[in-house]
Amino acid sequence: MRTLLIRYILWRNDGDPSYYNDDFKKLILFDELVDDDDVCTLIKNMRMTLSDGPLLDRLNQPVNNVEDVKRMIAISAKVARDIGRRSEIRWEDSFTILFRMIEKYFDDLMTDLYGEK
């Protein structure tokens, strides 16, 4: 699951077709949970610098169920899409934060996406 999410978010950042995976079709559906107009506000609330990727912990939004997990993934993907490609982005920090927030619900997410763990 971690590898899939990393590849998906990086793909959303640069659109590199070598990252594409058919599972992305399921993940991109999460975009409906986050309005495009809210992305600028979310970026502002994350107080990001030019070298930051999505810093979800700065939003102070709880993750209490699989729907919250989907929303966090959608926020990460949309922010990654909108910040543009830069070599200095510290993706490791962003992914560490994301996984720390959602790992408790990985099994639920797998069940939701694929009908199994």
Curated annotation (Swiss-Prot):
Induction: Expressed in the early phase of the viral replicative cycle.
UniProt-listed Pfam families: Poxv_Bcl-2-like (PF06227)
Record-linked InterPro entries: Orthopox_N1 (IPR009353), Poxvirus_Bcl-2-like (IPR022819), Poxvirus_sf (IPR043018)
GO BP: symbiont-mediated perturbation of host apoptosis; symbiont-mediated perturbation of host defense response; symbiont-mediated suppression of host NF-kappaB cascade
Function: Bcl-2-like protein which contributes to virulence by preventing host NF-kappa-B activation in response to pro-inflammatory stimuli such as TNF-alpha or IL1B.
Stated family: Belongs to the poxviridae OPG035 family.
Entry protein name: Protein OPG035
Organism of provenance: Monkeypox virus
